[in-house]
Amino acid sequence: MARHVWQAGRFEIGLDKPKIMGIVNLTPDSFSDGGVYSQNAQTALAHAEQLLKEGADILDIGGESTRSGADYVSPEEEWARVEPVLAEVAGWGVPISLDTRRTVIMEKALALGGIDIINDVAALNDEGAVELLARQADTGICLMHMQGLPKNMQINPKYQDVVGEVARYLKARAAECIAAGIAPQRITLDPGFCFGKTLQHNITLMRHLPELMAETGYPLLIGVSRKSMIGELTGETDAAARGHGSVAAALAAVARGAKIVRVHDVKATADALKAWEALGINL
């Protein structure tokens, strides 16, 4: 089903043109910018404001690193990281996404107010998560595919048919949400690049995004920014220096139908999309 609007809390986000989700990591150990914006809330808020100036349509705020092999973070620590920033950005009048896989963090944030989207790498598998979101009238949801858990997901991931298996998993998660009373227009899906996938799995998924979107019937949100696949493709070992490859991958995703791209390098991505569209490429 073709859909051109994502119901996301206070906003109906138009998907007729690709949207940019800017990443605000409040973690000391994220793979790319860990510790850069987690020192204090004011540093993080200044970064978030800069992302909006550069062209971000959505801010995605997270307090737990889900990189491969990431250390455990308690729910108390995760909430302590995100709460002061969420409390401030809630009044900015822009779509705010919370990147979390814990029901308790979702519940606290939704009670705080001003949170429009729950972006969950675990696809609402935490106990009570689906029921919590079903009780919300309009909160947007992004369900992501991951094989395994962050601590072990990159240890020899295997698939018989990566596109088919990812599609079936995401369809099943979306179906559970709808059965619980969540409206389909609130749902987007993320195939989970580099979450329990080899480089070849990631390449195959990217090349077959149109089939994945057709099979699932939902808009796709794609996150490839600065990830290991970009490093493997370009030979760049420094995650922070993978911006050029990340922009190219974001454009490749959009060209294949992705509606939202989650990125660190907002200005470069926004400029690339503007130039590409102006030069007559059908996005």
From Swiss-Prot:
Changing residue 204 to A: In strain: BT054 and MO124. One of its GO terms (molecular function) is dihydropteroate synthase activity. GO terms for biological process: folic acid biosynthetic process; tetrahydrofolate biosynthetic process. Changing residue 230 to V: In strain: BT054. It catalyses: (7,8-dihydropterin-6-yl)methyl diphosphate + 4-aminobenzoate = 7,8-dihydropteroate + diphosphate. Its EC number is 2.5.1.15. CDD domains: DHPS (cd00739). Changing residue 137 to T: In strain: BT054. Changing residue 259 to Q: In strain: BT054 and MO124. (7,8-dihydropterin-6-yl)methyl diphosphate binds at residues 66, 99, 119, 190, 227, 262-264. Keywords: Folate biosynthesis, Magnesium, Metal-binding, Transferase. Changing residue 50 to R: In strain: BT054. Signal peptide: none annotated. Gene3D superfamilies: Dihydropteroate synthase-like. Changing residue 241 to E: In strain: MO124. Belongs to the DHPS family. Catalyzes the condensation of para-aminobenzoate (pABA) with 6-hydroxymethyl-7,8-dihydropterin diphosphate (DHPt-PP) to form 7,8-dihydropteroate (H2Pte), the immediate precursor of folate derivatives. Homodimer. This is Dihydropteroate synthase. It comes from Neisseria meningitidis serogroup C.
